[in-house]
Amino acid sequence: SANDVALQIAEQIGGSVDGFVQMMNNRAVELGCTNTVFTNPTGLPDDNQHTTAHDMALIMQAAIQNESFRTIAAATSYTIPATNKAAARNLTSKFTMTDTGSTGFYEGCIGGKEGYTEASGSTLVCAAQRNGMTLISVVLKGASGQTAPDAASILNYGFDQFVTLSLGDSDFSIISGGDVVVPAGTGADSLTTEDSQNGDQIDRTYLFNGTSVGSAVLEVVQSD
């Protein structure tokens, strides 16, 4: 898992491994992770380090907003250019769900990470996109060789049971957002909204049965 690289990145960005770990924990809090504590950047076992499937999903949700991350996560191979010390070297990704030659290949998978330690068991976090909807799957404490099929089952359930609605309003112009994920067969008339004024704009939250399913920033349309 290139943990040597993880440590080098930590020192480069955080000034030290401990400094980077503090940055990791601060960012986790910003993302809404309430049950995560990092003690190292490698993921190797530590009695004081822990997380949950929900928190891992929040972290993955933030990660895939970064285009550079998506490009790297989706890459199946990379060539390290030659230097005056070594010839070019080819690296091949071993991530099952983006490997077209693997039985675990999943159409639409953006990327992800598999892992294993005795303490955590087999784990897998991934994201996939189909028909304009992106879903995240997290498998923790899985059985050996079973995490990719389990992740695929979770994603299949999501894509089969939920749809994305793009909402509009004749009285408002949507500046950002406006897409919601709801159970299949649900119409816009099943949603309720909560609005808050933010200067000249309106921050709108869409709810389904009291649960937030999306948001939008709106601007009032001025009539002639």
Task: Name what the model sees in each region.
Residues S1-H54, L58-E67, R130:
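Active-site-adjacent loops and short helices of periplasmic peptidoglycan-processing enzymes
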Residues C33-T34, D47-D224:
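Domain-terminus/edge residues, biased toward the C-terminal soluble/receptor-binding domains
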